[in-house]
Amino acid sequence: MALLEVLTFPDDRLRTVAKPVEAVTPEIQKFVDDMIETMYDEEGIGLAATQVDFHQRIVVIDVSETRDEPMVLINPVITQKSGDDGIEEGCLSVPGAKGLVPRSAEVSVSALDRDGNEFSFDADDLLAICVQHELDHLDGKLFVDYLSPLKRKRIKEKLEKIKKFNAKNQ
């Protein structure tokens, strides 16, 4: 397995809309394993393929307390939404920033698993929010898009300063 580089805002590649996975091949399965390893290494609870510059509809999520129950969602689709929720969200692609994002409280999802088998599930609480957040990535959308233009600008400026600082000190 290998760690993948996570793209950071405002990288334009994060705005790419992911294409459906045509077939779950051994290469896709290896990539999924690398995504899971990267998600755990980055201490995230979810990761979309778009965030690692692979523009196919793949998401990995683990909201379990023990951090040992990864979910793989290939070609995920939210089939139903209900209720209103929202928490202060963060993102591996927007390090150090958080913002309140309106989300549905419950979602129903259909997807393929790591082996290409179809499955469906209902999610609420943190899992529902995480699914919506990660599927936004597949559509080229970031949580900062839900924030005010001023807050989004401040986050962008902060991350650009950090990037310049890191580039100078390497």
UniProtKB/Swiss-Prot annotation:
| The keyword Protein biosynthesis is assigned to this record | yes
Reaction equations catalysed: N-terminal N-formyl-L-methionyl-[peptide] + H2O = N-terminal L-methionyl-[peptide] + formate
Q: What does this protein do?
A: Removes the formyl group from the N-terminal Met of newly synthesized proteins. Requires at least a dipeptide for an efficient rate of reaction. N-terminal L-methionine is a prerequisite for activity but the enzyme has broad specificity at other positions.
This protein is called Peptide deformylase
Q: Name one GO molecular function term.
A: metal ion binding
Q: What is its EC number?
A: 3.5.1.88
Q: Which family does it belong to?
A: Belongs to the polypeptide deformylase family.
Q: Which Gene3D superfamilies match?
A: Peptide deformylase (3.90.45.10)
Phylogenetic classification of the source organism: Bacteria, Pseudomonadati, Pseudomonadota, Gammaproteobacteria, Vibrionales
> Does the record's keyword annotation contain Protein biosynthesis?
yes
Q: Name one GO biological process term.
A: co-translational protein modification
Q: A Pfam family matched by this chain, by name?
A: Pep_deformylase
* Cofactor binding note: Binds 1 Fe(2+) ion.
* Organism, scientific name: Aliivibrio fischeri (strain ATCC 700601 / ES114)
The residues that the entry says bind Fe cation are C91, H133, H137
The protein's required cofactor(s) are namely:
Fe(2+)
Q: Which residues form the active site?
A: E134
Protein keywords: Hydrolase, Iron, Metal-binding, Protein biosynthesis
Q: What class of enzyme is it?
A: hydrolase
